UniProtKB/Swiss-Prot annotation:
Active site per database record: K65
Annotated Gene Ontology cellular component terms: cytosol
PROSITE patterns: OMPDECASE
Gene3D superfamilies according to UniProt: Aldolase class I (3.20.20.70)
Biological role: Catalyzes the decarboxylation of orotidine 5'-monophosphate (OMP) to uridine 5'-monophosphate (UMP).
Pathway entry: Pyrimidine metabolism; UMP biosynthesis via de novo pathway; UMP from orotate: step 2/2
Catalytic activity: orotidine 5'-phosphate + H(+) = UMP + CO2
Protein name: Orotidine 5'-phosphate decarboxylase
Length: 236
């Protein structure tokens, strides 16, 4: 993992097949973005996709959102780190003991993978939380889980852009805030509800931005990425 890659952009390779993911990755520049591998792609391809992306020079965020008993999650996180991924995540809802077990496993092995936690999925709104027995407002639940994640030694959390400012106040600037659902100006909201533009998200406090279809479905993905880079460079 390169300590010198200076970009907040993570491109989501949301494809069902290895050849599709690699075809897109080959159109991207690993010096200007990282890539994210999610559940469907990893379940269909296994570690081959990580090996191939690393071979192309990319740092990889393995977005599998582990949530299980502490020892099982610790083993899964260790396995991900052994594959050389830059970042991996767990569900903060799994609790303090689960998160601490995962962190301690990485520390014991001296593995440098960033371990972050998922708070509230960006597709979930107030009514969705009530249906699963959470009476708190989404922001209150995010703050509660982010504090727990930080106390448990996580490097950061996944959070929506609207929540980033509150989490910067709650957890500080050094606590990573990885924000999916990012849409450049004039993009549709697709299926993630709590969305802001890249510039708005970074101004709010996000440290990393996950972008999918606005780049991967563009006729020229690097031109689309360059548009986002220009937007980020504009004065806020």
């Amino acid at each position: 993992m390169s300590p010198d890659l200076d970009t907040p952009l993570i491109i989501a390779l949301d494809y069902p097949r290895l050849d599709q993911a690699l075809a897109m990755a080959e159109r991207l520049d690993p010096s200007r973005c990282r890539v994210k591998v999610g559940k469907e792609l990893f379940t269909r391809t296994g570690p081959r996709v990580l090996e191939a992306l690393h071979g192309l020079g990319f740092e990889v965020f393995l977005d599998l959102k582990f949530h299980d008993i502490p020892n099982t999650v610790a083993g899964a996180v260790e396995a991900a780190a052994d594959h050389g991924v830059w970042m991996v995540n767990v569900h903060a809802g799994g609790g303090r003991r689960m998160m601490e077990a995962a962190r301690e496993r990485l520390e014991r092995r001296r593995l440098g993978t960033h371990l972050i936690a998922v708070t509230v999925l960006t597709s979930m709104e107030r009514d969705d939380l009530i249906e699963v027995g959470v009476e708190a407002e989404p922001l209150s639940q995010v703050e509660r889980l982010a504090r727990l994640a930080q106390q448990s030694g996580m490097a950061g959390v996944v959070c929506s852009a609207q929540e980033a400012a509150a989490l910067r106040a709650t957890c500080g600037d050094d606590f990573l805030k990885v924000t999916p659902g990012i849409r450049p100006r004039a993009s549709s909201a697709d299926d993630q509800r709590r969305t802001l533009t890249p510039g708005e998200a970074m101004a709010a406090g996000s440290t990393h931005l996950v972008v999918g279809r606005p780049v991967t479905q563009a006729p020229d993905p690097m031109a689309a990425l360059a548009t986002i880079e220009r937007e980020l460079a504009e004065p806020s």
